[in-house]
Amino acid sequence: MRLWSWVLHLGLLSAALGCGLAERPRRARRDPRAGRPPRPAAGPATCATRAARGRRASPPPPPPPGGAWEAVRVPRRRQQREARGATEEPSPPSRALYFSGRGEQLRLRADLELPRDAFTLQVWLRAEGGQRSPAVITGLYDKCSYISRDRGWVVGIHTISDQDNKDPRYFFSLKTDRARQVTTINAHRSYLPGQWVYLAATYDGQFMKLYVNGAQVATSGEQVGGIFSPLTQKCKVLMLGGSALNHNYRGYIEHFSLWKVARTQREILSDMETHGAHTALPQLLLQENWDNVKHAWSPMKDGSSPKVEFSNAHGFLLDTSLEPPLCGQTLCDNTEVIASYNQLSSFRQPKVVRYRVVNLYEDDHKNPTVTREQVDFQHHQLAEAFKQYNISWELDVLEVSNSSLRRRLILANCDISKIGDENCDPECNHTLTGHDGGDCRHLRHPAFVKKQHNGVCDMDCNYERFNFDGGECCDPEITNVTQTCFDPDSPHRAYLDVNELKNILKLDGSTHLNIFFAKSSEEELAGVATWPWDKEALMHLGGIVLNPSFYGMPGHTHTMIHEIGHSLGLYHVFRGISEIQSCSDPCMETEPSFETGDLCNDTNPAPKHKSCGDPGPGNDTCGFHSFFNTPYNNFMSYADDDCTDSFTPNQVARMHCYLDLVYQGWQPSRKPAPVALAPQVLGHTTDSVTLEWFPPIDGHFFERELGSACHLCLEGRILVQYASNASSPMPCSPSGHWSPREAEGHPDVEQPCKSSVRTWSPNSAVNPHTVPPACPEPQGCYLELEFLYPLVPESLTIWVTFVSTDWDSSGAVNDIKLLAVSGKNISLGPQNVFCDVPLTIRLWDVGEEVYGIQIYTLDEHLEIDAAMLTSTADTPLCLQCKPLKYKVVRDPPLQMDVASILHLNRKFVDMDLNLGSVYQYWVITISGTEESEPSPAVTYIHGSGYCGDGIIQKDQGEQCDDMNKINGDGCSLFCRQEVSFNCIDEPSRCYFHDGDGVCEEFEQKTSIKDCGVYTPQGFLDQWASNASVSHQDQQCPGWVIIGQPAASQVCRTKVIDLSEGISQHAWYPCTISYPYSQLAQTTFWLRAYFSQPMVAAAVIVHLVTDGTYYGDQKQETISVQLLDTKDQSHDLGLHVLSCRNNPLIIPVVHDLSQPFYHSQAVRVSFSSPLVAISGVALRSFDNFDPVTLSSCQRGETYSPAEQSCVHFACEKTDCPELAVENASLNCSSSDRYHGAQCTVSCRTGYVLQIRRDDELIKSQTGPSVTVTCTEGKWNKQVACEPVDCSIPDHHQVYAASFSCPEGTTFGSQCSFQCRHPAQLKGNNSLLTCMEDGLWSFPEALCELMCLAPPPVPNADLQTARCRENKHKVGSFCKYKCKPGYHVPGSSRKSKKRAFKTQCTQDGSWQEGACVPVTCDPPPPKFHGLYQCTNGFQFNSECRIKCEDSDASQGLGSNVIHCRKDGTWNGSFHVCQEMQGQCSVPNELNSNLKLQCPDGYAIGSECATSCLDHNSESIILPMNVTVRDIPHWLNPTRVERVVCTAGLKWYPHPALIHCVKGCEPFMGDNYCDAINNRAFCNYDGGDCCTSTVKTKKVTPFPMSCDLQGDCACRDPQAQEHSRKDLRGYSHG
């Protein structure tokens, strides 16, 4: 349960809500309940925040724990050096390019020969949060390639998750011109926005390597040889900041270097220290400091140039980003910080804390909620409990006289919107809620109609089902509403949510811990506390809620102590056992730890229990059978008062830490917060040492002043603030979940990319039983956020934590507007977002004060967690703030003139030193006249080593030393090796070892990527060679479990559903639609077959998911059986699945009283559709077979080498001479006796093939293999076969055909000929198969040319040169349509006549055409009366024959011509003889109705409609009836019929029928059976996996058969364009 923690700019540590809130449920859709009016919102159809809207509304939400330090640390700015000791001159600022991501990519135009065989790229950059994926930082492209856009190399940012807006990382991709496919390597973690990063990529012809801040984070050996040949040099182009496909990067680039050699890691680290400043070396091809960008770089066509800025990128050398552990939330969970509070008693000096008891009275000041005796007794107990821990409490009692509040039931934990929702909610089941509005009562059916509106509150009708007696029980004129009003929508109801009470009282939570009283339902909840990392911790909505029945009562006083423990950051002592999500939860506590469980290493693991002693074993303890020395007497346990009596030292340290981190306002003392960590030594000379230190723990840089914004100001006088007021036009959810107020304050979503109730979503307000609303184009839905302090902004940060799967990163946020004080709205346009990296936007040249923003989205499920606005430097709001000062204390003391200096920055250089002397340094924070406690001390021996000097001092606990103070580069700032890194040498060179392709001894058992699946010595693992499964189709084929499992797959627990991407690596029953499968128990199974039957020692099952569902605590089990060669089954029992125990190894225990048996298959069965299995192995004894051993006869012995019985012989047997062609042999002896060994190494261009018993074990390109002589035979048969390059294809030479008479193995040659119309350019048309298995670079090319374009009918060629042959690919020819013809597809208003065709990459021209101009059909009243010479096309003549009398009447001929502009030259008239009216239409089909307001005369129209308003009128073919319309038929809709001049109705009413119309739920991700037909566009694609937005079909209703009415019927869907594999079985 790790929070979303960021290191934003200089580092952002998150703070968020506590554990326990449920994640957002899957949205269901049912008919809405009737009879309940909508809850009143803050305005018509709007949803507003809890505060009144206005720029100076209530105080803003507090900053996160850690203050502004954790909120944002601005880009490292070089500080003014301290006057004392700052002898070095600050280096001048360097230049950096800023790319906004909108077409500023640059192209290298300098005449440089780009590296062909090896290269190194080095760049300093600072990427913005939110990028188009992929975002190209720089890359080498081939502008001549027609077939491959990925030739060359690219360094950039892209997402590696199946979800295309999750987990963005730095990447390095490469594809040489000889390679068949591209290779991409990725950084080890998501990139950090706003941080300066030193990125390097190298390729030496054999290995690709990616470095981040000097650490090698990825490597690959897939690409080999040169990148491109000299022949294609002119085709290569170097791009910066994007690609020609607009994969543009957003952020800064500084110090760009390109080398034509692969630099070593040591050289890269050295380059990092010099910040990219190199002396001129012959290997250095390009070094850019952006002094003259236009000299070497040019923008793309129609593009612009990036901005050039001055950058002070590398000022402070100390990385102050302190991460909490995986299970922690804030700085106080950081192991280094909490260690200081544990070790230093000065950090636990006495603290006085104010708290306020809120006591409600009647108006006459009688009948208090709690008595004064209760208050005093509880206060005494509280003081006694905390006295020994240096925490004392100052009591303030607030007496509120308000009968309306006093007489109401205050509910502690009931969501009032659930009252009367037809589900019994135990937390709302109370007599004064009408037992959850009647939901928790079995109701009879009284004579409600008789009692309705009888002027009496009838309690047997006072339930939601009867509209609470028609409202009479909430009428204060009729009844005592404090006892009878249960309607949650009535203002007179008898109960209040405790948050409603808090909103009424509006008590400041920043000066006191507020204590409220509320009752719970039958659950009898004793108390509820606000965590210190909650947004509400310092607001009026924070505080503690206690049950007044227990408060201050003997035997129950420890409840308040327990809840105060929560408010001060303490978890339950049983958190690591009983409050984990599953037994695979990384926070499960197996031993006391600062990083798991309750984050205290002096509380042993314990389950939840109430006994005063160690608990017994339970069913929910994840395999724990017993617990000893549990902290049952701890205040944070659930034992009774007579048992609990203490906190542990670690808990006391946490409480003191949170009092410094969050709750300084609760304390009367003005003492500033301390610096929680010891100063760090950053460098030394012969006569000086340089120290830097961390900010104070509360993150403040300025003295706090009442009414000022100084607590929001950072170094550089930059103000950072979160939104304080939120609103949206969307309606509001009564529960507050997903409402705008959730986007106020700091980010608090724990698991980004998963739906969370702690966010705003456009869909928030919708009743979960109805269909979600859409956010219509072009504007969509929007959220408006206002900030307390209007300011001129420098940047904006937005946390978008969830985006629907049907939206990519570029479409979800379609606009952001800045709301200026002047009234102007500034649009920032659409933005690319990641769900796990915040969006950061640099605000250029705004130049005026901004007070708010509007965020627009087209995604109704999008979720926004928070927004943060950062000012420009030296903002007026911070100019008057007084900075905190620092005092450095030394032992031995500093000279008086030095000791008296107060430092404004966090750096100090001591020049008063003696070689070999021991010095200790402390730092004290000074605010006004108050001083903090001294920081922990750092001990420094002048002239000796320290963390950061490049030498590992193991006696000081150092594990590595890379000469810097940066986290995330393998060696932490405290010189400790980071997880999954290995560091070597001095100074340390660190590399991410998991997945680097090298199997090292320390990772043999842990790294599947590098070492494969670990097999213990003496055993042999066989992976499945075939498989059959119970449920499969093309989405989840069973064959994927054949062979070893994919190394890249990590086991996942607590999933909601399984994405289609999993089926590429693991099998799961995807044909079952979860959770509907839970309606009936289903058994799923797979059967794995093995090529070599063996005596099983164990069965191994590799998992990708362990079957646990997000909303359920139940663990899944599997049943495993062995199948022997006689098809008999041997049960291995039931086994619990857990990602913590993956792979699952099931030992096979043989009954020694029975004969051994050979197993040939394994059957695995389970009941959860969320189990995904990636591999099954059969483990047996290596070189030992008990079945064969038992069959040996007299005179025979078992041969392990042969694995068979052989005749026993005492004489020594030599092996035959070992002869391997194309190999070199290195034998341990010239003799070939038993035990002799020979090492076989294949020559260059040959590959080892190793066989045993004529079966190929493996083929490897590795250097050698060792064979051993065993009992007269070599234990392996080895051959060296030439590598095979396979037949060349278009990747080698485009537009060519190949001939390989010599074959395709090493050394052979193939020739190629150019296919017409391509022409050979060059002389040598031969390719050679090289030793690396790839073809050599071609020395000639086939240049594609187009012949003269063919004539286009009805068009004239306009380009004269196009009449000749030899046109290059990409060239154009222009045509113009002849009069009366136009280009197809052009609009009716402006019919285009000119068009171009292009010479394409296959040597042909794009097709062009000219189609005749057409006129609209004549009016329908003339239908059937006219004849046309050529339809309605240009020059066609249409005629109606009239009698001669028309001409005599001067009407002229009834003839019209279609003109070239698509209009008729005239119009028809009704002939004189055409008189009368149509007959009354009476032959109507059932349900059809005609309305003829103008009668039945010629030209009159009748509107068609259906008696059933849900039906539509259509025309059906004669042979089709309404009852048998096939789903693929899409009949024409009819809105009206007309009486023609021939006195006939058109269309004829007898052909018109009424059919069921389409429900308005198309495209809503639910497959509605009624809409699953062509007439309704197959429900907008909702019924096919390939077309539904969520890629998972959800039927509605859920009983709808996925093989019947809700089947995929759309003939255009992908499912019907490929072979259906359903039912196909491997086995």
Swiss-Prot record:
Propeptide: 23-81
Region annotation Disordered: where it falls in the sequence: 23-99, 733-754
Biased amino acid composition, Low complexity: 42-51
Subcellular locations according to the entry: Secreted
Record-annotated disulphide pairs: C144-C235, C327-C622, C332-C657, C414-C428, C424-C440, C457-C473, C474-C485, C583-C600, C587-C612, C710-C878, C713-C881, C753-C835, C775-C781, C947-C975, C960-C971, C983-C990, C999-C1011, C1036-C1070, C1051-C1139, C1192-C1205, C1215-C1269, C1227-C1238, C1242-C1280, C1285-C1329, C1300-C1310, C1314-C1342, C1346-C1399, C1362-C1373, C1377-C1410, C1415-C1458, C1428-C1438, C1442-C1471, C1478-C1539, C1492-C1502, C1506-C1554, C1558-C1576
Signal peptide: 1-22
Induction and repression of expression: By 8-bromoadenosine-3',5'-phosphate.
This enzyme's EC code(s): 3.4.24.79
Region of interest (Metalloprotease), ranges: 272-583
Species this chain originates from: Homo sapiens (Human)
Annotated family: Belongs to the peptidase M43B family.
Subunit structure: Homodimer; disulfide-linked. In pregnancy serum, predominantly found as a disulfide-linked 2:2 heterotetramer with the proform of PRG2.
CDD domains, sorted: CCP, ZnMc_pappalysin_like
Residue ranges of the TM segments: none
Cofactor requirement: Zn(2+)
Pfam families linked to this entry: Laminin_G_3 (PF13385), Peptidase_M43 (PF05572), Sushi (PF00084)
Protein name, UniProt field: Pappalysin-1
Known catalytic reactions: Cleavage of the 135-Met-|-Lys-136 bond in insulin-like growth factor binding protein (IGFBP)-4, and the 143-Ser-|-Lys-144 bond in IGFBP-5
Tissue: High levels in placenta and pregnancy serum. In placenta, expressed in X cells in septa and anchoring villi, and in syncytiotrophoblasts in the chorionic villi. Lower levels are found in a variety of other tissues including kidney, myometrium, endometrium, ovaries, breast, prostate, bone marrow, colon, fibroblasts and osteoblasts.
Residues at the catalytic site: E563
Gene assigned in the entry: PAPPA
Example of a GO cellular component annotation carried by this entry: extracellular space
Family matches, as InterPro entries: ConA-like_dom_sf, LamG-like, MetalloPept_cat_dom_sf, Myxo_disulph_rpt, Notch_dom, PAPPA/PAPPA2, Peptidase_M43, Sushi/SCR/CCP_sf
